[in-house]
Amino acid sequence: MTAQNFMNVVRFKLKSDCVYNYFEVIDKTSFEGMTQRYIAKTGDYDYCFVGIWKSAEAIATQRPAMIAHLDEVRGFMEELSPELGVTDPVSGNIVSKVGYHD
């Protein structure tokens, strides 16, 4: 295990006219216990959010704040499916890490 041993990944799609608004909000957002955040553009309006956390407890503590944040940006997002809604989230322990930034 690594010192930073928990991550969450969220797939989402932005409405074409809301990209700027979304990034205005997300660039001002931080969560206690999240040590790194990445957003990859995977399609024209498709994105993948990756958060690295100090621990599973850290993300659990911030869950209410993350839900409040989602409520703030939900209107900027397209529904992925009726089952998923506007996000497709997963999270878990980091079991392998290769990189130069320790």
Regions found by a protein language model. Give the residues of each.
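Short S/T/G/P-rich N-terminal loop/turn motif that feeds into the first structured element of a domain
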Residues: M1-D71, G75-D102
